[in-house]
Every structure is written in structure tokens, then in C-alpha cells.
From Swiss-Prot:
Organismal lineage: Bacteria, Pseudomonadati, Pseudomonadota, Alphaproteobacteria, Hyphomicrobiales
Signal peptide positions (record): none
Transmembrane segments: none
Protein name as annotated: Guanylate kinase
Gene Ontology CC annotations of this record: cytosol
SUPFAM superfamilies given in the database record: P-loop containing nucleoside triphosphate hydrolases
Record-annotated Guanylate kinase-like domain positions: 16-195
Amino acid sequence: MKDGAAGSLNGIERRGLMFVLSSPSGAGKTTLSRMLVDEAPGLRMSVSATTRPKRPGEVDGRDYYFVDRPKFDAMVEAGEFLEWANVFDNCYGTPRAPVEAALSAGNDVLFDIDWQGTQQLRSRASNDVVSVFILPPSVQDLEHRLHTRAQDSDEVIRGRMKKAGDEMSHFDAYDYIVVNDNIGVAFESVKAILRAEQLKRERQIGIDAFVREMRRELEK
């Protein structure tokens, strides 16, 4: 259940942050992202633009902005993305305008992106980025999850498994590591990370005024 006002904690104004979840395909970042958005107050999911085909049940503008390759290339050329990458022959990118609007309003923005996108975000706004890398408990478990979700062909799954090793090699570029052996436990870990980062003094931009007012009252 969400509660509290966006842009504040205990009535203290704060700056929004960009919260990144990355993982090899099948390790659970998308499930964790949805759980976090459902429960964390003031957290909004960043909606990426993509050139990949729409999957059953997906809605344009909610899950992704589905665009063709010429449109995507034009957006890159115009500098409309905070980050973008080519993944499995499809392009993904984060539109700049809605993210900047959310942060300026004091909302947190959640990113379900790969390590390349994370590095691009850091290069543009390092102080506002908090990154978490999700690992599977084993290679066997990862492969089992990819087969169980029945979204991809065997050939695509082999490609995802091959890429997983490269993605895992960048774990040390992240602030936090969570092993997803149990989705409930992993979720509690990720939620605790978000809460701790929200409470950091430097993000509570209204804390000086809050303390000054209490001191003023004590001095009466």
C-alpha cells in the first residue's frame, strides 16, 4: 500500500532519485520492479521506447513506447534519450523529458535497464543514480527460469545465456548486489535499499529549514 506525499519524507522536502535495477535476462528484475512500484510511495516506473515487437498483453505507453527504427534513430539524433542501447538486435532508450519532470517534482524514478544504460545515466547524473544488480542463485536456475516463462525460442535463450556472463562481469559497477534466490526476500532487500537511499541527508533538501524551525521553537 502506498502512502505519504511524493517529494517528501515526514514532511521534509527531498530530491527525487533514479533507482536502477539490472540483471541478466530471467534473474527477476522485471518482477521486482513491478512489486516495488506497487508498494513504494512516490516511485514511478520509467517507460522506455523500444523497436522490439509488442508482446501479448503489453500496452503502448504503459509498458513501452513502441516505435520503428527510423523514429528511434531520430530521437537519438535529437538528444531525446537519457540513455539508450541495442540489445538482442532491438533498441531501447529512456526518454529524457518525463524523467526530468518527475525528478523535479520530487518523485523517484525506477529504471529496468542494462549495465550500458546504467553507465550512461551515471555519466549524466551520478549524484542522483542508485544502482542495484540482481543475480540468480545459479546458472542452472537462470536457464530454468528462461525456459519456464516460455517467451523465447531455444535459440534466443541460448543467446541470453551467452550474454548473461558478460552482463554479470559488470557487477562491480553497481552500488548494491542482491541474489534472487527467493523473490519475497529479494524484494525486501531491494525495498530496504530504496528506503535507506531516500533517507540520506544530502537528498533531504528541506532538512536545514526543518531543523532551523525546531531550534527556533526551542529557543523561545
